[in-house]
């Protein structure tokens, strides 16, 4: 199950976090109008909470244009980090649009793991969790070829 959040839903965890925990989605996608999605910023902290409890995968993303509006006081510029992926198995992964590319596509795979009920019954490893399996830059030349 996928749960979509917009900027304010992620920024203000109450009451949204309670609803997300009650639903228990496998994947949360947070669409943000924000700066670069680096591990140090606020979105990463809130995404980590959702990835840990209820244990879903979280993708927070912003547009390349919004990320490039960022003007950090000290180098290096991280203005091409447009997304952050976090799941229950791996640490946070910054997703950056490389120079020369206009976008980036992500590939997801499914990892199966066992979950248990409150009384100790397992599901036999049938619980599916999306995990990040690849990042693929899209260049303007590749985009022109598809038209």
What is the predicted role of each segment?
Residues 7-122:
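CN hydrolase (nitrilase-like) catalytic-core segments centered on the catalytic cysteine
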Residues 2-3:
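A structural signal for the main folded, soluble domain(s) of proteins
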């Amino acid at each position: 199950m996928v749960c979509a959040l917009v900027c304010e839903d992620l920024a203000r965890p109450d009451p949204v976090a309670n609803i997300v925990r009650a639903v228990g989605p496998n994947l949360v996608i947070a669409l943000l109008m924000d700066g670069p999605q680096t591990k140090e910023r606020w979105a990463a902290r809130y995404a980590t909470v959702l990835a840990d409890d209820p244990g879903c995968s979280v993708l927070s993303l912003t547009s390349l244009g919004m990320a490039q509006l960022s003007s950090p006081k000290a180098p290096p510029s991280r203005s091409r980090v447009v997304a952050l992926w976090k799941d229950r198995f791996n640490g946070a992964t910054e997703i950056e649009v490389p120079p020369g590319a206009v976008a980036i596509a992500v590939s997801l795979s499914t990892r199966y793991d066992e979950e248990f009920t409150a009384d100790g019954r397992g599901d036999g490893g049938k619980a599916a969790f999306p995990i990040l399996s690849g990042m693929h830059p899209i260049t303007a030349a590749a985009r022109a070829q598809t038209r």
